């Protein structure tokens, strides 16, 4: 445990006492350092170790403490003004800074300070919240939202209007995670710490939370909270036991390997179901 982590852990236990005018400089500095680590990608709220996603709870605590340490302030935007506790990531960026980061940010995309945007990411008019991590080569399309602490992998496509849910509390809960090389179709919602594993294709209009049934067509089994690697998922319904009604579910219609996915377009995968 480093010094900043220890300070944040201790301060979080008495967070009800903390306010912008009632906090030690030591705590403010530790939180600021943690947010800097998140902002630059040197640390992340969750990381994959030995095939499992591990949550760094102290970084979540730092984000939550930052809300208690900050007043709302006037924030000037290109077309309007704002009033919030968290500054914009790019408020002080110059043209040189953007070129150095190798990112493309289309107005009026909004990224909060404390989110990491990797090189070669394209943000169409979209929103990325504090603590989020967006890895290389990812496209965040128009009106898509990436929630607090969400983890987005390399070469992911978040289509128009996609919602990736944020998870700050409970602290031990995994954030919503979209692994490398996934495609999330327009207006789909992945929330509540659901994990979409590498190379999966989510069709348009699929909604998956922790209580959503995920039906595997090939095996007839039902699972929750995780989409296995290489899955092709569409929206559907399952009948009730008495046959009187049906309820929504997400259906895994097939699973494909990387070789198949590289040869076959996304539309082809979704048509041949």
Swiss-Prot record:
Stated name of the protein: 2,3,4,5-tetrahydropyridine-2,6-dicarboxylate N-succinyltransferase
Q: One Pfam annotation, family name?
A: THDPS_N_2
Q: Which organism is it from?
A: Nitrosococcus oceani (strain ATCC 19707 / BCRC 17464 / JCM 30415 / NCIMB 11848 / C-107)
Q: Which reaction does it catalyse?
A: (S)-2,3,4,5-tetrahydrodipicolinate + succinyl-CoA + H2O = (S)-2-succinylamino-6-oxoheptanedioate + CoA
The entry's substrate-binding residues are 104, 141
Name its pathway. Answer: Amino-acid biosynthesis; L-lysine biosynthesis via DAP pathway; LL-2,6-diaminopimelate from (S)-tetrahydrodipicolinate (succinylase route): step 1/3
Q: Which CDD domains match?
A: LbH_THP_succinylT
GO terms (BP aspect): diaminopimelate biosynthetic process; lysine biosynthetic process via diaminopimelate
Record GO terms (molecular function):
2,3,4,5-tetrahydropyridine-2,6-dicarboxylate N-succinyltransferase activity; nucleotidyltransferase activity
Q: What's the gene?
A: dapD
């Amino acid at each position: 445990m480093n010094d900043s982590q220890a300070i944040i852990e201790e301060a979080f236990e008495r967070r009800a006492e903390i306010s912008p005018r009632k906090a030690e400089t030591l705590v403010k500095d530790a939180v600021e350092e943690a947010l800097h680590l998140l902002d630059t990608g040197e640390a992340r709220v969750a990381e994959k170790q030995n095939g499992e996603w591990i949550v760094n709870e102290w970084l979540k605590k730092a984000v939550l403490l930052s809300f208690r340490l900050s007043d709302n302030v006037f924030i000037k935007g290109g077309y309007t003004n704002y009033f919030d506790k968290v500054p914009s990531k790019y408020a002080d960026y110059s043209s040189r800074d953007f070129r150095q980061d190798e990112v493309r940010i289309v107005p009026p995309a909004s990224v909060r300070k404390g989110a990491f945007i990797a090189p070669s990411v394209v943000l169409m008019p979209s929103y990325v919240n504090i603590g989020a991590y967006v890895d290389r080569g990812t496209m965040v399309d128009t009106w898509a939202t990436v929630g607090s602490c969400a983890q987005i992998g390399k070469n992911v496509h978040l289509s128009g209007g996609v919602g990736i849910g944020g998870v700050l509390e409970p602290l031990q809960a995994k954030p919503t995670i979209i692994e490398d090389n996934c495609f999330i179709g327009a207006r789909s919602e992945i929330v509540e710490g659901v994990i979409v594993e590498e190379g999966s294709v989510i069709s348009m209009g699929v909604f998956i939370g922790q209580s959503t049934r995920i039906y595997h067509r090939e095996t007839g089994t039902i699972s929750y909270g995780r989409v296995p690697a290489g899955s092709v998922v569409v929206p559907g319904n399952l009948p009730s036991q008495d046959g009187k009604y049906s309820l929504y579910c997400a259906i895994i219609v097939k699973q494909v390997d990387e070789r198949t996915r590289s040869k076959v377009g996304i539309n082809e995968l979704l048509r041949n179901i």
